[in-house]
Amino acid sequence: MLTFEDVKNNAAIRTYIQRADESLIARGFTEHSYAHVTVVAETAGYILETLGYPERTVEVAKIAGYLHDIGNLVNRIDHSQSGAVMAFRILDNLDCDPEEIATIVTAIGNHDEGTGQPVNAVAAALILADKSDVRRSRVRNQDLSSFDIHDRVNYSVKKSQLKINEEHTLIKLKLSVDTKYGSVMDYFEIFMQRMILCRKAAEKLGLQFKLMINEQQLI
């Protein structure tokens, strides 16, 4: 069976992730390289493992997380759909089980807030993992005077935590924000759609979604 480690160590996949990120660098986007996809993979796995999903489902979620942004190699627009098609070809060539390919492709094709929906548990975990990866280290632009709103919001986040409570009824995204660089309103201006999708994803997993910024509950 194909494992997460197999995918992480695949030279072709690493090339696609690197080149996709290079395209986003050219367009001024935040980091979407190995750091981001690894965080997303591990977080998606954490969510399903914590909720008691089978070990293989957890592994499939991690694979989906690692591959979820390769569509940026084609174009940022519709990257979830192009990424799903790329993932299908890659996984098929690696003799991945068709049932697992179907789950991974569906999750990748539904992870973006523009058209995505948490259609299965892996898709839901991927959405929550991806949208919660907000952090200062993703900002590449070091000239604070030229920051756009995306730079300001990501740079302002000193710490980000996504945790499920012990009762497995609640998933909470806690952000520590330095308002010197970005306001809470800035966050909502660019992330409102993402937070709505996170709420839907949490509900798919039988959870409530809560957002806390600087210890204040906002959702």
Descriptions of predicted regions:
Residues 2, 28-51:
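N-terminal low-complexity, intrinsically disordered segments
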Residues 4-22:
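Short alpha-helical hairpin
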Residues 25-26, 36, 49-164:
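Divalent metal-dependent catalytic cores for phosphoryl transfer on phosphate-bearing substrates
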Residues 133-219:
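Terminal helices and disordered tails flanking the catalytic cores of nucleotide-processing hydrolases
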